[in-house]
């Protein structure tokens, strides 16, 4: 038994450095144990690759997940003001599938205007897993066309007597929308009152003050907390590894089956019968041993890529990846290795066709090349 295992192991690794000799043995005596071992190695290497690849990407995570805070005055939150809060469907900034409103309030002949949202689920802005940014659009108008003398943003913690405070006096100009991102958390410079806790943020207040009375309006849109997390962190390590394992097993099995089917069909078109399909599946499966090698090498190259923070919008994700990764040598090398590996499998398949049918090397290479072309086209549609 031990000798048989060693023999199987020697044959599958021999595919890498002496493919003609290895496939002669495999064709003479196809062994299911060998191809299963190959597939296990490929699955393991694919899990490693996917782990490295996913650990280099952080995805935007929001609270709330949509634009819900500025699409209704009361839901899982409440808007209040020194004026009358309302939804403005004509002047807003987000304009996404979740809604197209801003929250607005106006006062007459006053020196200040404030808007605050409270009674939402507690937001954690502390530690590595907490949210570390607050984003919002804000717009104000003063009919006297004067600038505010002061502006503050408060983050309430449990009650309105306990809060963090930041200055927002210079964030915007009259009648113009300003997109603002404020860093939040214990390592940021916020004034704290009454033992406010970053783990428990329960309300937000915008307040602008002028020296003289005037008719004032304030509007807020796109209000949410944000951080960036990797898919692995989001799922949890155990769940993420299980997902990667299942995903890798499915991907490897589908690639194996699809490639074998393409080779069989293309060979028939060229007048070559490769015999029983189940036998060919076992033989051609040994060629995937190279996948375990080039996948690990590519994972090593990708391990030096910079971590990228990706927004929710898919088009913006592609733009970020193109800007951060495409010019990177590690990405170029890693991608080139992946394609070189596909060509390597094609070359090994040509060896299999040549040995099984005793056809010319030219015809075997042509069949394998056409199969590669078919697989390439299919990848454009099904991945």
Where are these regions (language model features)?
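Hydrophobic alpha-helical transmembrane segments and adjacent short intramembrane/lumenal linkers
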Residues: 276-383
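Short, membrane-interfacial amphipathic segments enriched in basic
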Residues: 1-17, 235-239
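Short carbohydrate-recognition loop motifs
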Residues: 88-117, 175
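Extracellular beta-strand elements of beta-rich domains used
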Residues: 182, 204-206, 221-223
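Cytosolic juxtamembrane amphipathic/interface segments immediately preceding
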Residues: 12-34
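Short beta-strand-plus-loop segments that form exposed binding edges in beta-rich domains
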Residues: 205-214
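Hydrophobic alpha-helical transmembrane segments of multi-pass membrane transport/permease proteins
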Residues: 29-54, 370-375
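Extracellular ligand-binding interfaces
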Residues: 108-192
């Amino acid at each position: 038994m031990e000798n048989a295992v060693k023999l199987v192991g020697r044959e599958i690794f021999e595919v890498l450095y002496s493919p003609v000799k290895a496939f002669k043995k495999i064709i003479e005596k196809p062994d299911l144990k060998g191809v299963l071992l190959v597939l296990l190695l490929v699955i393991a290497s694919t899990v490693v690759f996917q782990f490295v690849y996913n650990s280099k990407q952080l995805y935007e995570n929001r609270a709330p997940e949509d634009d819900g805070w500025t699409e209704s005055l009361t839901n899982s939150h409440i808007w209040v003001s020194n004026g009358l809060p309302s939804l403005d469907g004509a002047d807003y900034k987000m304009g996404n599938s979740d809604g197209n409103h801003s929250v607005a309030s106006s006062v007459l002949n006053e020196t200040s205007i404030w808007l605050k949202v409270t009674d939402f689920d507690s937001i954690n802005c502390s530690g590595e897993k907490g949210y570390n940014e607050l984003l919002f659009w804000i717009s104000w108008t003063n009919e006297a066309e004067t600038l505010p003398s002061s502006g503050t943003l408060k983050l309430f913690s449990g009650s309105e007597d306990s809060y963090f405070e930041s200055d927002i006096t210079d964030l915007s100009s009259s009648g113009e929308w300003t997109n603002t991102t404020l860093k939040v958390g214990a390592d940021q410079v916020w004034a704290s009152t009454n033992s406010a806790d970053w783990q428990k943020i329960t309300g937000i207040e915008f307040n602008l003050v002028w020296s003289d009375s005037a008719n004032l309006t304030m509007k807020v849109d796109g209000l949410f907390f944000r951080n960036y997390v990797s898919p692995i962190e989001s799922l949890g390590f155990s769940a993420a590894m299980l997902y990667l394992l299942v995903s890798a097993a499915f991907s490897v099995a589908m690639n194996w089956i699809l490639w074998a089917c393409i080779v069989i069909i293309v060979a028939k078109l060229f007048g070559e019968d490769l015999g029983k399909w189940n036998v060919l599946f076992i033989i051609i499966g040994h060629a995937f041993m190279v996948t375990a090698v080039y996948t690990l090498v590519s994972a090593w190259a990708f391990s030096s890529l910079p971590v990228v923070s990706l927004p929710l919008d898919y088009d913006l994700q592609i733009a970020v990846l193109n800007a951060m990764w495409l010019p990177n040598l590690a990405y170029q090398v890693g991608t080139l290795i992946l394609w070189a590996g596909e060509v390597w499998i094609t070359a090994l398949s040509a060896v299999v066709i040549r040995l099984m049918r005793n056809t010319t090397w030219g015809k075997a290479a042509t069949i394998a090349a056409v199969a590669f072309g078919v697989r390439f086209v299919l990848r454009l549609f099904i991945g």
